[in-house]
């Protein structure tokens, strides 16, 4: 058997590859020589048919490697480079133009955005300052309103005291004038007046005239202004009225104003109480505590305004109403029936029928009692008109006092 020969050029290829000085084309040629030697050895040993299918593929691969290593011709490279340079030049010009547009556009937008931001910040600061001013003015307004309410209350109290003092002063002047007059010069009218005052129960030693008590109770007097004016027009007959017409009209005007204020305060109190009762978040214990506090405060205010000692609490006061609202239980729907009671319908149905019989049975007797008590009840007050509503309120409040 013939010894295997080394492929020519293989040691040189290794040395060139190690040295790194061979070109790509030379490497392809050395590779082709080595592969050809190996294929010839295979054909000599095993026959030409052993490498017949492999040779065309190896040759095609080596040709492609040669074309890739050598590259195209210089003329073809120049022809393909010219349009590429033109396209590159055009793209550079377009790039410069786009850069200029991009550089000019954002500057204007940034300037506009900067101005808008400054305006927005300034408006936000102004709005915050306005909100602070409005909040401060609102607090000042509330404080002024509270002061005004206190001043109005003090003014009304001072007016009431002034009217009482004027009444007492006039009464003292009249008593002093009567005391200075000689006893034999007393007129028959003065004697009759002294006799009537001495016989009237509840008068203080018969010295204070009747017009003094009437003037002190002017805010709660239920008389009509026309009747008061008629009484004013006859000062010589009674010898008791010492007020002028202007003073009496001023007193009536103050009384009407006070009644109007009391009516408005009652309406406002009823509204707040209605809101409080309809609020389901308020517990019942708090409502009871508020009930006791309102009742005590009402007694204190009443005793202070009337100048009487504070009354002790009684069982009737505790059971009495503490609000100005009417009973509106009929407005609320009945609670829904429990589903558990439906399983025991026989027992609950019997209880419901018995309760209905109990509620329906005393109705005739109750109606009869009302009919019997109706003739004994006093005659109802006449209806109040829009002009005399405050007078009617005073008339209804006088019997209670």
Swiss-Prot record:
- Keyword Zinc-finger recorded: no
Biased-composition ranges, Acidic residues, are: 310-319
Q: In which tissues is it expressed?
A: Ubiquitous. Strongly expressed in fetal heart, heart, stomach, spleen, adrenal gland, thyroid gland, salivary gland, fetal liver, liver and lung. Poorly expressed in brain.
Q: Give the SUPFAM superfamilies listed for this entry.
A: RILP dimerisation region
Q: What is the effect of changing residue 306 to A?
A: Abolishes interaction with RAB7A and localization to late endosomal/lysosomal compartments
From what organism does this protein derive?
A: Homo sapiens
Protein transport among the record's keywords?
yes
Where is the segment annotated Disordered? 167-239, 304-388
Gene name of the record: RILP
One GO term (biological process): cilium assembly
- Subcellular location, record wording: Late endosome membrane; Lysosome membrane; Cytoplasmic vesicle, Phagosome membrane
Q: Quaternary structure?
A: Homodimer. Interacts with RAB7A. Interacts with RAB34. Identified in a complex with MREG and DCTN1; interacts directly with MREG. Interacts with CLN3. Interacts with FLCN; the interaction is direct and promotes association between RILP and RAB34.
Check the record and name the InterPro entries matching this protein. Answer: DZIP_RILPL, RH1, RH2, RILP_dimer
Phosphothreonine is carried by which residues?
Answer: 308
Which Pfam families does the annotation name? RH1 (PF09744), RILP (PF11461)
Record's function text? Rab effector playing a role in late endocytic transport to degradative compartments. Involved in the regulation of lysosomal morphology and distribution. Induces recruitment of dynein-dynactin motor complexes to Rab7A-containing late endosome and lysosome compartments. Promotes centripetal migration of phagosomes and the fusion of phagosomes with the late endosomes and lysosomes.
Q: Which Gene Ontology CC terms are recorded?
A: ciliary basal body; cytoplasm; late endosome; late endosome membrane; lysosomal membrane; lysosome; phagocytic vesicle membrane; protein-containing complex
Q: What is this protein called?
A: Rab-interacting lysosomal protein
Q: Which UniProt keywords apply?
A: Coiled coil, Cytoplasmic vesicle, Endosome, Lysosome, Membrane, Phosphoprotein, Protein transport, Transport
Which residues does the record list as Phosphoserine (modified residue)?
A: 314-315
């Amino acid at each position: 058997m013939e010894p295997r020969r080394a492929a020519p050029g293989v040691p040189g290829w290794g040395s060139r590859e190690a040295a790194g000085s061979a070109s790509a084309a030379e490497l392809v040629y050395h590779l082709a020589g080595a592969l050809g030697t190996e294929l010839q050895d295979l054909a000599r040993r095993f026959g030409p048919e052993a490498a017949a299918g492999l040779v065309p593929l190896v040759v095609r691969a080596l040709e492609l490697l040669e074309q890739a290593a050598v590259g195209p011709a210089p003329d073809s490279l120049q022809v393909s480079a010219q349009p590429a340079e033109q396209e590159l030049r055009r793209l550079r010009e377009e790039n410069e133009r786009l850069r200029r547009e991009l550089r000019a556009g954002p500057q204007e937008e940034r300037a506009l955005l900067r101005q808008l931001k400054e305006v927005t910040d300034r408006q936000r600061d102004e709005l915050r300052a306005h909100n602070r001013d409005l909040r401060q003015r609102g607090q000042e307004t509330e404080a002024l309103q509270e002061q005004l309410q206190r001043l109005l209350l003090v003014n009304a109290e001072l007016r009431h005291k002034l009217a009482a003092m004027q009444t007492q002063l006039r009464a003292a002047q009249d008593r002093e004038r009567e005391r200075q007059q000689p006893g034999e010069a007393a007129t028959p009218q003065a004697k009759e007046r002294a006799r009537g005052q001495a016989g009237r129960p509840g008068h203080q030693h018969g010295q204070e005239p009747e017009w003094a008590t009437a003037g002190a109770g002017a805010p709660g007097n239920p008389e009509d202004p026309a009747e008061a004016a008629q009484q004013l027009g006859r000062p010589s007959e009674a010898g008791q009225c010492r007020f002028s017409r202007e003073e009496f009209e001023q007193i009536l005007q103050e009384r009407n104003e006070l009644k109007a204020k009391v009516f408005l305060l009652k309406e406002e109190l009823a509204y707040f109480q209605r809101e409080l009762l309809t609020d389901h978040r308020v517990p019942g214990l708090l409502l009871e505590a508020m009930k006791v506090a309102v009742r005590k405060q009402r007694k204190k205010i009443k005793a202070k305004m009337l100048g009487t000692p504070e009354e002790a609490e009684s069982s009737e006061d505790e059971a009495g109403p503490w609000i100005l609202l009417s009973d509106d239980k009929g407005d609320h729907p009945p609670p829904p029936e429990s589903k558990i009671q439906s399983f025991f319908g026989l027992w609950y149905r019997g209880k419901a029928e018995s309760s209905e019989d109990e509620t329906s049975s005393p109705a005739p007797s109750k109606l009869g009692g009302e009919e019997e008590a109706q003739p004994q009840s006093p005659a109802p007050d006449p209806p109040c008109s829009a002009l005399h509503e405050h007078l009617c309120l005073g008339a209804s409040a006088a019997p209670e006092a």
